[in-house]
Design a protein with these regions (language model features):
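Catalytic, metal-anchored helix/loop core of enzyme active sites in primary metabolism
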Residues: 1, 56-58, 65-161, 167-170, ...
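Substrate-binding/catalytic subdomain of NAD(P)-dependent oxidoreductase enzymes
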Residues: 1-83, 88-90
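Generic structural signal for well-ordered, non-membrane alpha-helical segments
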Residues: 4-8, 33-37, 110, 114, ...
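Acidic active-site catalytic centers that drive phospho-/nucleotidyl reactions
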Residues: 6, 10, 120, 162, ...
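Secondary-structure transition/hinge residues
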Residues: 19, 125-129, 201
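Aromatic/hydrophobic pocket-lining residues that form π-stacking "cages" and hydrophobic walls in ligand
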Residues: 40, 170, 193
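Short secondary-structure junctions
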Residues: 48-49, 175-180
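Single conserved hydrophobic/aromatic residue that forms the stacking wall/gate
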Residues: 191-201
Length: 201
């Protein structure tokens, strides 16, 4: 749970159903919450965000490549996913025709688990009685886009000396590496950057 492997398995299943291709757990990039600190959560709160462990599945409409990843993300307070807490889970879907949809409910506990297992048993019994194997056919293996080729926004918090010119020096390092800075707040030593990366926060 903490390192996102459970969420990754769920994301692989959802991606397979959503995109009609076979995605397995090994295709999913994982980054858990064990490195998230109280300071990270406090900074996110000051900026109007909450930190959530998200499973994200995307498909490139041009290439058909699928990217599935699990990592901590800063979710705006006004986003529906920000209110998902405790034993509740949510699936947030964006589609061309339907726009944004969210499916919300309990994802843990005796009753929800028993309900899901019972539903699977009923499906299996119906399929056996009808001589079928369900409505999903055999999927072809997904073309997976690796995390190195995935671009996302993230926030970098730096502890720096409180003296003139420090922020200029920091931004100069990013400029040397071709990283654009959208916004910076020196009081909190925060820099918002956008660049393909292995780390997402």
């Amino acid at each position: 749970q903490v390192e996102g492997f459970d969420a990754g398995a769920k994301a692989a299943i959802i991606a397979s159903i959503a995109f009609g291709v076979k995605v397995v757990a090994g295709d999913v990039y994982h980054e858990g919450i064990s490195n998230i600190t109280a300071s990270d959560i406090a900074i996110a709160g000051r900026l109007g965000y909450v930190v959530k462990l998200l499973g994200i599945a995307e498909q490139d409409r041009d290439t058909g490549e699928v990217a599935v990843r699990v990592h901590p993300a800063m979710v705006p307070n006004e986003h529906p996913l920000a209110s998902v807490r405790d034993s509740y889970n949510a699936v947030f879907v964006e589609g061309d025709a339907v726009g944004s949809l969210m499916f919300f409910g309990r994802g843990a506990g005796g009753d929800p688990t028993a309900s899901a297992v019972l539903g699977d048993l009923i499906d299996a019994a119906v399929n056996r009685d009808q001589g079928t194997h369900g409505s999903l056919g055999a999927f072809q293996r997904a073309r997976v886009r690796q995390i190195d080729a995935t671009s996302a926004e993230y926030l970098l918090a730096l502890d720096v000396l409180d003296q003139p010119g420090v922020l200029h020096s920091v931004t100069g390092v990013f400029a040397e590496h071709g990283v654009s800075i959208r916004a910076a707040e020196q009081e909190l030593s925060l820099i918002h950057i956008s660049e393909p990366t292995r780390r997402y926060f």
